[in-house]
């Protein structure tokens, strides 16, 4: 039942998300002011990684069979007809791009926090923060490469998967998930960390930004108040989205791993819920970033083409 529903869902989801990501990509590249170059670069990279992630997950259509030992990864998508090592590598690529996307959201929140304080940091400080945020990505990629080399490249392992997948019908087995090696623990720790760190950091940042805005409330025009309100609303949505879509299913994931129980909803839908932010993030960005919202308003005939008051304390990224 799940397989039939998701075989219809994935193509529809891809058809909805892909044009939206392309639209955001064009808006970010063409309509980002010069004072938003750092934010522009972050959003540009996030569009790329989210697009790669959604395309790969729709082609793979994964199911992690958690009650088996070791846990098997089943592929129901078009890539099930390829050799297992190809799908297994692309599985890790989709995982890495999802983690990078979450980290880029954290970087965006950090930039907004620094801008809200109206403090101009040295470029070296931003570089240090970016490097620190990217360290888990390098560790993750290294651990994934090790897993591919040890679990898929060996001739006997490739032959085993050829035998298992010799008569592919609705799915193929592309790999295993074990928690018996240091790289496997690193992978799951980094993935979980990227999911569970975003909501508290986003909500904490929201509280700090509101504090800075309220401290200058008496000297703020109505237009700036409106722009800041939409900015904060966007930050709230950005922080709460993983709290709603990702955290519950990952808690279920931990439970089924620990108990070796079979929960079909978790097995089939964890990949679906990982995809949800790629659908909502473009709309949140277009809503919460004033120049993009202004441009869309002009296209819709709901905004005048006159000069826009820029909230330098928040948007000067």
Swiss-Prot record:
Chain segments annotated as transmembrane: 8-28, 42-62, 89-109, 128-148, 185-205, 239-259, 270-290
Subcellular location: Membrane
This protein's UniProt keywords: Membrane, Transmembrane, Transmembrane helix
Membrane topology field: Multi-pass membrane protein
Main localization, broad class: membrane
GO CC annotation, single: membrane
Database matches in InterPro entries: 7TM_GPCR_serpentine_rcpt_Srd, Nematode_rcpt-like_delta
Keyword Transmembrane: yes
Family, per entry: Belongs to the nematode receptor-like protein srd family.
Protein name from the UniProt record: Serpentine receptor class delta-47
Upper taxonomic lineage: Eukaryota, Metazoa, Ecdysozoa, Nematoda, Chromadorea
């Amino acid at each position: 039942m799940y397989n039939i529903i998701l075989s219809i869902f994935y193509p529809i989801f891809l058809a909805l998300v892909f044009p939206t990501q392309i639209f955001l990509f064009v808006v970010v590249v063409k309509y980002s002011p010069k004072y938003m170059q750092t934010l522009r670069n972050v959003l540009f990279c996030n569009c790329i990684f989210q697009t790669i992630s959604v395309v790969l997950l729709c082609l793979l259509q994964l199911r992690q069979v958690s009650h088996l030992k070791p846990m098997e990864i089943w592929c129901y998508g078009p890539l099930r007809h390829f050799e297992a090592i190809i799908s297994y590598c692309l599985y890790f690529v989709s995982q890495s791009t999802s983690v990078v996307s979450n980290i880029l959201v954290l970087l965006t929140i950090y930039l907004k926090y620094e801008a809200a304080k109206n403090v101009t940091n040295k470029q070296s400080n931003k570089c240090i923060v970016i490097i620190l945020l990217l360290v888990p990505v390098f560790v993750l990629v290294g651990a994934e490469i090790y897993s591919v080399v040890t679990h898929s490249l060996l001739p006997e392992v490739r032959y085993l998967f050829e035998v298992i997948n010799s008569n592919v019908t609705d799915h193929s087995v592309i790999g295993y998930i074990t928690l018996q090696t240091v790289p496997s623990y690193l992978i799951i720790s980094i993935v979980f960390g990227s999911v569970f760190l975003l909501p508290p950091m986003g909500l904490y940042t929201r509280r700090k930004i509101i504090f800075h805005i309220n401290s200058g409330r008496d000297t703020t025009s109505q237009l700036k108040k409106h722009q800041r309100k939409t900015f904060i609303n966007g930050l709230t949505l950005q922080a709460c989205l993983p709290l709603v879509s990702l955290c519950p299913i990952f808690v279920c994931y931990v439970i089924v791993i620990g108990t070796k129980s079979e929960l079909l909803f978790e097995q089939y839908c964890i990949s679906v819920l990982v995809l949800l932010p790629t659908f909502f993030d473009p709309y949140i960005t277009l809503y919460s970033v004033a120049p993009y919202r202004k441009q869309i308003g002009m296209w819709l005939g709901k905004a005048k083409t006159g000069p826009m008051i820029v909230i330098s304390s928040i948007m000067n990224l």
